């Protein structure tokens, strides 16, 4: 520190040597400035300003170092958190892919089941329609047979009525009545 002060004084005094006239005179501005400067430096040294400045600079350096260490720790922690979130994002993406694949499989199975159900429903409806058609055919055939029987009975009745005598008719009626009585008992 003393060397630095001496160096500053020596450098500050160089321009004073270049002035004209006697240097050590209160009329020489350079001399007065040199004396004021030396007094100023002396006061600074007396009140230990350089050591205070160095202490403040050391404290500031320590604060900066602590801030840098804290920033490094925060950066490391942030990198760990980022890695954790990236890992979780990959896991979530994998789960989402699995869910989508499962949904596609379920949709495919549901579509196949719907096709099978539709085929079964169509087969049931076809069977029902075929049964109704067969029933309608049977009913129509029965109606045709009944009508044919009615027509045949009416024709036979008319033929018998025209060809039979009254005594034959009454004998047939009596025979029919006795047959009905025997069947009912």
From Swiss-Prot:
Protein's job: F(1)F(0) ATP synthase produces ATP from ADP in the presence of a proton or sodium gradient. F-type ATPases consist of two structural domains, F(1) containing the extramembraneous catalytic core and F(0) containing the membrane proton channel, linked together by a central stalk and a peripheral stalk. During catalysis, ATP synthesis in the catalytic domain of F(1) is coupled via a rotary mechanism of the central stalk subunits to proton translocation. Component of the F(0) channel, it forms part of the peripheral stalk, linking F(1) to F(0).
Propeptide: 1-19
Organism of this sequence: Rhodobacter capsulatus
Keywords: ATP synthesis, CF(0), Hydrogen ion transport, Ion transport, Membrane, Transmembrane, Transmembrane helix, Transport
Topology in the lipid bilayer: Single-pass membrane protein
Subcellular location: Cellular chromatophore membrane
GO cellular component: plasma membrane; plasma membrane-derived chromatophore membrane; proton-transporting ATP synthase complex
NCBIfam families: PRK13455.1
GO molecular function, one term: proton-transporting ATP synthase activity, rotational mechanism
InterPro entries assigned to the protein according to its UniProt record, in alphabetical order: ATP_synth_b/b'su_bac/chlpt, ATP_synthase_B_chain
Alphabetical list of PANTHER family matching this protein: ATP SYNTHASE SUBUNIT B (PTHR33445:SF1), ATP SYNTHASE SUBUNIT B', CHLOROPLASTIC (PTHR33445)
Protein's name according to its UniProt entry: ATP synthase subunit b
Quaternary structure and partners: F-type ATPases have 2 components, F(1) - the catalytic core - and F(0) - the membrane proton channel. F(1) has five subunits: alpha(3), beta(3), gamma(1), delta(1), epsilon(1). F(0) has four main subunits: a(1), b(1), b'(1) and c(10-14). The alpha and beta chains form an alternating ring which encloses part of the gamma chain. F(1) is attached to F(0) by a central stalk formed by the gamma and epsilon chains, while a peripheral stalk is formed by the delta, b and b' chains.
């Amino acid at each position: 520190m003393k060397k630095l002060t001496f160096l500053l004084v020596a450098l500050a005094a160089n321009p004073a040597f270049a002035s004209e006239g006697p240097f050590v005179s209160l009329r020489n501005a350079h001399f007065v400035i040199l004396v004021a400067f030396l007094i100023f430096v002396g006061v600074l040294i007396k009140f230990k300003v350089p050591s205070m400045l160095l202490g403040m600079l050391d404290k500031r350096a320590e604060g900066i170092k602590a801030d840098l260490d804290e920033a490094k720790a925060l950066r490391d922690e942030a990198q760990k958190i980022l890695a954790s979130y990236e890992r979780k994002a990959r896991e979530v993406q994998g789960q989402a892919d699995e869910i989508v694949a499962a949904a596609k499989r379920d949709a495919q199975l549901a579509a196949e089941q719907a096709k099978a159900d539709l085929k079964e429903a169509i087969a049931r409806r076809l069977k029902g329609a075929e049964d109704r058609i067969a029933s309608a055919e049977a009913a129509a055939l029965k109606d045709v047979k009944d009508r044919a029987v009615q027509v045949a009975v009416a024709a036979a009745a008319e033929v018998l009525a025209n060809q039979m005598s009254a005594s034959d008719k009454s004998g047939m009626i009596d025979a029919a009545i006795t047959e009905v009585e025997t069947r009912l008992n």
